[in-house]
C-alpha cells in the first residue's frame, strides 16, 4: 500500500486570509530549507523517526518565522496518522487513505493546507521515477504516477474508505 511507504508534510495556516496563507508558505520554505536531515533518510521509518526526533527544532523554526513576520500565533508540530483524500503533487498522485505525516499547525489551523511528500523526497528535490522506484515497488510507482484513468479509481477508493469509516 502506497500509504505505508510515504511520509507526508502537512502545514495548516491559521486562516484563509491572504496574510495567513502567505505566512504558511514562509513557514514551509524555512522548514524545508532547515530540515536537511530528511534527505539522508533511507526508509519511511527513518523519515518518521527523524521528524519525531526533531519536533522541537521544527516547531522553533516555524515559531521564529511567525514572530519575525509580526504574529503571535502558537505553532505545533507533531507526527500524526490521518486520512487524506486523493492529492496531486507535481508528477505524483497519491490515492486516498491513511498516511503518516509531519503536521504543522499555525494558530487555529483553520486555513487551507499545503502538503508534500517528505519520503520519498518529492518535496525536497525533483523526484524522478527512478527515485520513487528505489523505495516503492513497481505497482506502487505505476499507481501514483499521473496518467489517464486514475481519477475514477481513486474516487472509488475514497468512497469505499469513507463508507468503511462510517460503519466503524
Please provide the spans of the model-predicted regions.
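Membrane-interface motif at the C-terminal end of an N-terminal transmembrane signal
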Residues: 1-2
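Early exported N-terminus immediately downstream of N-terminal targeting peptides
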Residues: 5-55
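Soluble periplasmic/extracytoplasmic beta-strand elements of cell-envelope proteins
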Residues: 6-12, 74-78, 101-105, 115-117, ...
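Solvent-exposed coil/turn segments that connect beta secondary-structure elements
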Residues: 12-16, 80-82, 107-109, 119-122
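Intrinsically disordered, low-complexity acidic/polar segments
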Residues: 18-20, 86, 113, 125
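Amphipathic, coiled-coil-like alpha-helical scaffolding segments used for oligomerization/assembly
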Residues: 45-86
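Soluble extracytoplasmic domains of inner/organellar membrane proteins
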Residues: 92-150
Amino acid at each position: 500500500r502506497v500509504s505505508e511507504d510515504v511520509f507526508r508534510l502537512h502545514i495548516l495556516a491559521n486562516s484563509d486570509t491572504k496574510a495567513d496563507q502567505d505566512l504558511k508558505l514562509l513557514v514551509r520554505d524555512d522548514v524545508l530549507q532547515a530540515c536537511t536531515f530528511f534527505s539522508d533518510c533511507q526508509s519511511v521509518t527513518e523519515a518518521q523517526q527523524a521528524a519525531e526526533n526533531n519536533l522541537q527544532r521544527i516547531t522553533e523554526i516555524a515559531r521564529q518565522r511567525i514572530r519575525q513576520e509580526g504574529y503571535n500565533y502558537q505553532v505545533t508540530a507533531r507526527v500524526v496518522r490521518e486520512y487524506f483524500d486523493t492529492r496531486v503533487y507535481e508528477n505524483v498522485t497519491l490515492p486516498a487513505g491513511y498516511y503518516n505525516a509531519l503536521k504543522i499547525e499555525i494558530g487555529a489551523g483553520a486555513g487551507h493546507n499545503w502538503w508534500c511528500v517528505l519520503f520519498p523526497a518529492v518535496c525536497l528535490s525533483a523526484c524522478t521515477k527512478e527515485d520513487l522506484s528505489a523505495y516503492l515497488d513497481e505497482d506502487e510507482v505505476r499507481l501514483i504516477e499521473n496518467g489517464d484513468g486514475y481519477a475514477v479509481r481513486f474516487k472509488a477508493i475514497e468512497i469505499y474508505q469513507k463508507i468503511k469509516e462510517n460503519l466503524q
